[in-house]
């Protein structure tokens, strides 16, 4: 992704987030996915053209899915602005997204997400030790290539103001750029990663606070 492409895409996502629902409303499924080739769509305007004839439910589904997919690309772009972070050079290789410090032991699949409902009443404890939440993610979210688990870096978005603010939080690019830069500076192979099912993971918490400030928290580094 070039700087120009990032600028266009980040602007598109900030526009799109205003009209997409917080929740899916439908489970990801092949019958809906086959209606359009979402992975060939590069811009918000093109997406709207492709889904124009679909039902409102399908429109919401594709808007949300495309938003999350493209948001992940923007996250990876921001990480790769740091000299010690490189993107997987093989776009077809799904075993990892990013590598830190030219170290194959620091390869991670990057996963944007939120704090699950069952953990929201104990956020302070989760931030202090997210092990249980990480285990929940691995047990309940999609697994990696050929049903094998991958090292994962979870980007956990949470708004203390309103849960509906968690989607716009994903588009706070200036905030994220600073957070990812700090993380890239701190990560080492000696970090206290969470181990589960023979893989390792870490969490970057991205918070919007009640006073409108934004803060972050790292677990392993």
Could you tell me what each predicted segment is?
Residues 1-94, 112-221:
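Nucleic-acid endonuclease domains
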């Amino acid at each position: 992704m070039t700087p120009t492409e990032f600028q266009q895409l980040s602007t598109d996502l900030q526009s799109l987030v205003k009209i997409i629902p917080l929740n899916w409303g439908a489970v990801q499924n092949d019958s809906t996915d086959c209606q359009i080739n979402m992975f060939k769509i590069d811009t918000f305007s093109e997406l709207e053209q492709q889904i124009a004839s679909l039902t409102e439910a399908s429109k919401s589904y594709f808007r949300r899915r495309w938003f999350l997919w493209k948001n992940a690309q923007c996250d990876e772009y921001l990480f790769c602005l740091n000299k010690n972070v490189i993107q997987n050079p093989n776009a077809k290789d799904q075993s990892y997204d990013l590598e830190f410090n030219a170290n194959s032991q620091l390869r991670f699949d990057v996963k944007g997400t939120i704090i699950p409902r069952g953990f929201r009443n104990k956020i302070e404890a989760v931030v202090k030790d997210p092990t249980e939440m990480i285990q929940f993610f691995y047990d309940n979210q999609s697994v990696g290539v050929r049903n094998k688990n991958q090292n994962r870096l979870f980007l956990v978005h949470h708004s203390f103001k309103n849960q509906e603010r968690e989607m716009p939080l994903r588009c706070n690019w200036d905030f994220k750029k600073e957070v990812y830069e700090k993380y890239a500076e701190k990560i080492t192979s000696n970090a206290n990663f969470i181990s589960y099912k023979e893989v390792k993971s870490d969490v970057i918490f991205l918070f919007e606070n009640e006073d409108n400030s934004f803060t972050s928290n790292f677990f392993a580094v």
